[in-house]
Structure formats: C-alpha cells, structure tokens
Amino acid sequence: MDVFVKILSDFGFTRLSSSLHVPIVVHCMPGAGKSSCIRALLKADSRFVAYTLGVPDPCNLDGLCIKAFTGSVDLKYFNILDEYARYNGDASDFFALFGDPVQSPPRNLYRAHFKAVLSKRFGSCTAQLLRELGFEVESTKEDLVSIRGLYDFDPVGTVIYYEKEIGCLLRAHSIEAYEPEEVVGKTFETVTFVTAENHIPAESRHLVYQCLTRHRSVLHLMTPDASYTST
C-alpha cells in the first residue's frame, strides 16, 4: 500500500480519503499521467499487474506493460484495471481501479480515493474553456483554442464529430473525420471539433468532453454561430 500511495503522490494525484479500502479508486482528467503512473507501479513492485479496457501497451523487453483485459485475473497479484468505467462486472478482484467517469460514465460509479485534475496533454486555454463548460481541469502548458462558424473555416488537423448529421456533412465535403470511439486513447497535435450545437446537450456531455480533449497544441471548434456554452 505504501508503494502505491507514494507513486500516486509522485505523479500529482491528490488523496481524498484518509481511509483506503480495496478496490482503491483513482479518477483523473485526460492527460493527467494515468498510464505513466500505472507503468511506474509495475516497475516498482512485481506484485502489481495491470489491465485495461482501453488501448493496451505494445509488448516490450521488460515484460512490463498494461495488458488487454480478457475477463479474468490471477488473484495472487495486486490487479489494476484501467478504464474501469467500461467494466460491468464484479470489481472485487481488483486492487485498484483507474478511470475518468466524465469521459466514460460508468454504470457503477465509485467514490474516488485519489484524483488528478492537472492535464499534461493540452494547455491552459483548453482548460479555461473546459472549466467554463463545467468540467474540473487545470493546465500549466500553453495551447491555442479558437471557435469558428460552421461555414467560416476549413477544418485542419484531425477532425472529430459525434452527431450523425455532422458526419454526413463532412463526408459530403470529402473530409476525413472520426467519432470519439474511433480515437479512444489517441492524441493529436491539432484537432477540429465540428458540432451542430452551440451548447452541450446533457445527454452528450461525455462525447463533447472526449472531442475537446484529444489535442496537444491546437483546438478549433466549429459551431453554427461561432459560440459554445454549457447551456
């Protein structure tokens, strides 16, 4: 337990509870260093084994990687499950659960023992936009955010959307674009998010959040009237 707590502290995770019990729940923003933290745990103590319901690590010579979860674990290890929000089974076999309940709303939401709100992926302009939209996030990096009209700007970089009508519009203009599910676990230098709304629909909040957090340096939003609000 001491190794686990120390490494989470080293990676900037804030402890929220003085009492810890298994499974230990860790929530964080995109780009908070979750995967790097899990890899550090694997390297620090051979009792840890990590699985994910997201994109697994490629094989390496050390044999230390976050593996694809296939449905069962070896109970003699301290098993960690990443992207636990995608899991619908019994979590009692896991020592720790890592995930982002905002990005992937779980069927079973656990109260967090640790959290991290500082993103090392995107910058302060994106963080400010996300806070204005009601998300808890911070960043000390620099980046660029612009909000453009739907027909006033040509999409650049990786184009992301979540509405079917926008997908049809982009295809009609021969623009290659992706839905959130297609870019899970991926990061791009520049992203253009195209939407038919000027605000976040409550039922699509998690999808918007995913679309707004895939970039490192530049984010362009294209909306009907070049504005975007939480309501």
From Swiss-Prot:
Domain (+)RNA virus helicase ATP-binding stretches: 1-123
GO annotation, cellular component aspect: host cell cytoplasm
Primary location: host cell
Location of the (+)RNA virus helicase C-terminal domain: 124-231
PROSITE patterns: PSRV_HELICASE
GO-annotated biological processes: symbiont-mediated suppression of host innate immune response; transport of virus in host, cell to cell
Location within or outside the cell: Host cytoplasm
GO terms of molecular function: ATP binding; RNA binding
Disulfide bonds: none
Keywords: Host cytoplasm, Host-virus interaction, Inhibition of host innate immune response by virus, RNA-binding, Suppressor of RNA silencing, Transport, Viral immunoevasion, Viral movement protein
Subunit structure as annotated in this protein's UniProt entry: Homodimer and homooligomer. Interacts with capsid protein. Interacts with host AGO1; this interaction targets the host protein for degradation, thereby suppressing the antiviral RNA silencing.
Main function: Transports viral genome to neighboring plant cells directly through plasmosdesmata, without any budding. The movement protein allows efficient cell to cell propagation, by bypassing the host cell wall barrier. Increases plasmodesma size exclusion limit. Acts as a suppressor of RNA-mediated gene silencing, also known as post-transcriptional gene silencing (PTGS), a mechanism of plant viral defense that limits the accumulation of viral RNAs.
Protein family per UniProt: Belongs to the Tymovirales TGBp1 protein family.
Other observations noted: TGBp1, TGBp2 and TGBp3 seem to act together for cell-to-cell propagation. TGBp1 is the main movement protein that physically cross the plasmodesma with the viral genome. TGBp2 and TGBp3 would facilitate TGBp1 function.
Name the record gives this protein: Movement and silencing protein TGBp1
